[in-house]
Amino acid sequence: MDFIIDAIVEWLKGLLVDGIMGNLDGLFDNVNQSVGEIATQVGTTPADWNAGVFSMIRQISETAILPIAGVILTFVMTYELIQMLIERNNLHEVDTWMFFKWVFKTFVAVMILTNTFNIVLAVFDVSQHVIQQSAGIIQNGTEITPDVLDSLRTELEAMELGPLFGLWLQSFLIQLTMIALNIVIFVIVYGRMIEIYLLTSLAPIPFATVPNRETGHMGQNYFRSLFAVGFQGLLILVCVAIYAVLIQSIAADGDPIGAIWGCVGYTVLLCFTLSLIHISEPTRRS
């Protein structure tokens, strides 16, 4: 009789160990997948992320925003000419070189305005290159291999049936929690790209204010915003890399319970950090 009970207990323990290891495999596979997906998303330019959306944003910018920017540029350059004339002793000392200077500034301003999209895309091309170079290093250094979980299986096989059952329930519930946390990460990463499209659509207006000293701060702030959002992807990637390294360390500790709850804790920390980055950038720009 004891033989039968022992056999049933061993069979149940085997099922629970396999179930827990399956859940842990899912958790750590999710880490590898998340690092790869986020590296791909944050390293994609607006033109490559979604061609249809980018084409729509470009048409809106060129047909609706650019004419308004042209009117603003006309006002700015007229105001600039008046300032240049008044600065020379209220029109008593007018030199012809001033008009050549004004014509040159107007020509440069018009060229910048007509090439607004090329300038914006150049900013994101630079940030994409930096992110892609970093992504290769990060992914190669943080990938969690199946060998890391071998020590966890040994620890599980040495546990009794009761603790194994409790651990299996915990790992199952934590998988559901991880799904919700992944949705939060998805919203943050994709929300960044929507913010990029919104910034890109309004680009001609701040570009039109650059030539004048008094109104140029609007264009300068826009440039800072553009670079901040572009390189924000690198900060997101670094956060995910730190997360992956931390997960890798708890997976190698050989403590199943600590690995499960540590994974949840680090994932919550990742969501908080990504939210902090996403919120702090607009605050710093304002």
Put a short name on every predicted segment:
Residues 149-164, 244-264:
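Membrane-interfacial helix-loop-helix connectors in multipass membrane proteins
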Residues 132-174:
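Membrane-interface interhelical connector segments
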Residues 112-145:
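Functional transmembrane-helix hotspots
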Residues 111, 115, 172, 176, ...:
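Hydrophobic alpha-helical segments of membrane proteins
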Residues 105, 109, 220-240, 244, ...:
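Pore-lining and gate-forming transmembrane alpha-helices of multi-pass membrane transport proteins
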Residues 275-286:
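Residue-level detector of conserved catalytic or cofactor/ligand-binding positions
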Residues 1-72:
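Binding/recognition "hotspot" determinant
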Residues 72-110, 202-216:
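Hydrophobic transmembrane alpha-helix segments characteristic of membrane transport
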